[in-house]
Structure formats: C-alpha cells, structure tokens
Amino acid sequence: MDVLTVCDVGIERHDVAELPQLLERQDAVIWVDIPVCDEVSIDVLAGVFGFHRIAVRDCAERNHVSKVHIYPDHVFTVLHAPQLGKRGHVHYIELDQFIGRNYLVTVHGPINPVVDPEVALRETRAVHARIAAGRFRPGSAFELSHAIVSALARNQETFVEVVTRDVWQLEQRVTGGDVGDPEGFINELFRARHGLLAVRTMAALSGAIYGRLAGLTRIPTGGQALMADIADQFDRVRAVADGEKEYLQGVIEFYQTVLTINAALVGQAQNVEVQRLTEASYAQNEEIKKISAWAAIFFAPTLIGTIYGMNFDHMPELHWAFGYPSALILMLLLSVALYVIFKRRRWL
C-alpha cells in the first residue's frame, strides 16, 4: 500500500499510520494506492476511512460489471480496462476508486493469475511518474482521478486500435482469398468480435457512470467538467468500437457469402459429375441391352441345333424328309421374332 501526498512542491510518501493526521490536511491531496486488497487494506478502508462495507467488499472481490455508489462525502466507482489474453480472451482489469473531498483511494481489484500484476498498475504508475517528474500537479482529488481514468480510457482506445488492425488483416485475407483453414479463420473473426464487444461494454458502462457523476451538484467546483470530459472520452471509445464492430460484421457477412458461393459451386460441380456418371451408366445399360438382345437372337438357333445334335437312339425328327429345312425355318422364325420383339422394345 502506497500512502502519498500530492501538493504544489511534488509528491511525498508516508507510512500507513500517518493516515489519520494526513486526512486533516487541506494543502494536499492524499492518494492511497492499494495494489492488492488484503486484510490490512480492508482494515484501512473500513477503519480509517469508514467506507461502507458493501464498497469494501467490492474492492476485495472481482467485479465483472462497472458500477458507481454515491455517498454523502465521497464517490465509489468500479471501472475496467481490457487486456488481451491467449487465444483472444479478454481479461477485465479492475480499478476501484474512492473519491473524497481531499483524498483519492485507488484499489486494484483481483486479476486472473495468468495476467502480469504490473498490468493492473499501468494507469496509476503512469500518473505517478508524471507527478514525480513535475509534469502534473493535481489540485484536487477529482483532478487526480481524472488523470488516472483518462489513462484507463486511452488504454481502452489502444485496445480498440489493436483489434482494428486485426480486423483489417482479416478483411484483406477474405478479399484476397487467403483464409487458410475456414474453421480457424471463423474463430479469428469471432475472437475479434468478442474483443470489440468487451471493450465496447466497458466503455459504455463507464461512460454512463461518469455521465451520472457529471450531473451531481455535490461535486466540487471544476469537478463536474472533469467528469463530463471523462464521459466524453468513454463515449468516443464506445463509438469507435461500435464502428469497428459494424465493419467487422460486414467482413463476416462477406466471408459467409464467399463460403455460400463456394459451397454452391462445389454442389454444382458434384451435380455435373453425378449427371455425367448417370449418363455413362445409362449408356452402359443400353449397350448391355443390345448385347443381351443379340445373345438371345443367336441363342435360339443354337438351341434348336443343340437338340438335333443330341444323337439319341430314338429321334424321329432325324428321319423326317423335311426335318432339316424345318429346323432351318424354325431357327429363322425364332430369330426374326426375337429381333422384332427387341426392336419394338428399343433394345436394338
């Protein structure tokens, strides 16, 4: 836990035990930055500052939705900044604030263990560095909070820019026909969409919070303008995220159209192939019918000749005077009859 006083001459670090005396000062802004909300921090929040137990509990637990609680002498906010994780997952980096008359308490909410703890401190570290270098001298707790939250809004905007570059690359791959594995490409599209939706939600909720704070009459002089400025920053991030989301939706729809056309072309090619195979099968059947018909025609004379060639002892037909011509005529008649039948059935 860092206990700091910020005044015209710079920034100074103090012990936690000095907090009750420091809060009595009117010539400085008291800034308490809590990287991890442990038991000691909870005791300070509840015991020294006397914050509401629900607000203290929110600091100790992970909150997935931004919120604001307005109390008579201070304001409590829960904000989020995005951090891109592996495989397109978006981590919610939480920043809680208690903004009072002459103090600001920043609490960095619990984060996923896979996220570098330094990521949660980037906004407060950046503002601390500006104060230490003499580039920034906040005159009130609201001015100090404005600087920190503005850094958070810029991080949201930077996240949108990163996702936007990914969207442009995805569009180029779609229009260039270089999508590779379709399933993997679809996953990339929806990871980008997930990122834009996540940061859009963060910005929209944060903008609504600061829009509400800008309308409070209890905010000190100049504080309302600072709150309104932050609300505008979040609204701008939301608008940019909305625009990129619509742009990405166009890329997704175009890719779906490409997939549909490709599927139709493949189906058409398959239909042509099936038609070709059907025609080949039909032609083959026609040839088989012709072969079968001619085989039947030639089989009839062969049958008669086979009967006469049996050479049994008792075959009266062998001794008929007209046996031979009768056999020839019968062979001819059978052949002609079969030919006529097959011809009528269009087998020949």
Report each predicted region and the residues it spans.
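N-terminal pre-transmembrane cytosolic regions of membrane proteins
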Residues: 1-60, 110, 119-127
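Membrane-associated alpha-helical segments
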Residues: 102, 171-176, 180-308
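Cytosol-facing regions at membranes
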Residues: 1-2, 10, 20, 24, ...
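Alpha-helical transmembrane anchor segments
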Residues: 289, 295-348
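Short, surface-exposed charged micro-motifs
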Residues: 65-67, 94-96, 200-202
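Short, structured protein-protein interaction patches enriched in aromatics and acidic/basic residues
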Residues: 60-77
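Extended alpha-helical interaction modules
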Residues: 72-187, 204, 211
